[in-house]
Amino acid sequence: MAELVSVAILGYLLGSIPVGFLMGKLRGIDVRRYGSGATGGTNVLRTLGPWAALFTVLCDIGKGLLAAYLGERLAGEWGFVAAGLLASLGHSYPVWLRFRGGKSVATSGGVMLLHYPLAVLVGIAAGALAVVPTRWVSLGSLTASLAVVLQLFLLDAPLSHRLLVVALAVVIYVRHWENMKRIAAGTENRLGVKARPRA
């Protein structure tokens, strides 16, 4: 039990590293004051541009992957689950930023990348297919998440892994609740729209 608690804390701390926020600070910009207010790749793209967004996404993937690897290495199968889930939660709710972070898509993808790289790639492809006609990045994120969940159930993955991927999807969908309402209303921001200062 002590090992699980330790890797869960480690996962949270890794996940809570606010890469997007730090990228903005390097340029004197607080990304939380623009667009959606999130610190993840999409809002960084709209606020700081493509290169900052690419770096942010890669680092966010790396956080999840490293947390999952260390969790499994130190505490086995359930260590992978605990560290992976807490990395995702840490990204969305970082203590350093008063629990206002990103939306956990890239970090969750990094977690699942450890054991299911093909499923993650298929999820990315499914997400891209959703983005191309709509230009709604949020819809692509939701589609990708669901695609990975479905694949793990079709693959008959271990129960612990299926529980993890469902939990990660729940985090992603909760964090995208406002996006889903805007999608339903047809008012969601489309890819290419620059972030505006928040009121």
UniProtKB/Swiss-Prot annotation:
The chain crosses the membrane at residues 4-24, 51-71, 77-97, 111-131, 152-172. Its EC number is 2.3.1.275. Pathway: Lipid metabolism; phospholipid metabolism. It is a multi-pass membrane protein. One of its GO terms (cellular component) is plasma membrane. It is an enzyme of class 2 (transferase). It is found in: Cell membrane. Pfam families: G3P_acyltransf. Disulfide bonds: none annotated. One of its GO terms (molecular function) is acyl-phosphate glycerol-3-phosphate acyltransferase activity. InterPro entries: G3P_acylTferase_PlsY. Keywords: Cell membrane, Lipid biosynthesis, Lipid metabolism, Membrane, Phospholipid biosynthesis, Phospholipid metabolism, Transferase, Transmembrane, Transmembrane helix. It catalyses: an acyl phosphate + sn-glycerol 3-phosphate = a 1-acyl-sn-glycero-3-phosphate + phosphate. GO terms for biological process: phospholipid biosynthetic process. Belongs to the PlsY family. Probably interacts with PlsX. Catalyzes the transfer of an acyl group from acyl-phosphate (acyl-PO(4)) to glycerol-3-phosphate (G3P) to form lysophosphatidic acid (LPA). This enzyme utilizes acyl-phosphate as fatty acyl donor, but not acyl-CoA or acyl-ACP. This is Glycerol-3-phosphate acyltransferase. It comes from Symbiobacterium thermophilum (strain DSM 24528 / JCM 14929 / IAM 14863 / T).
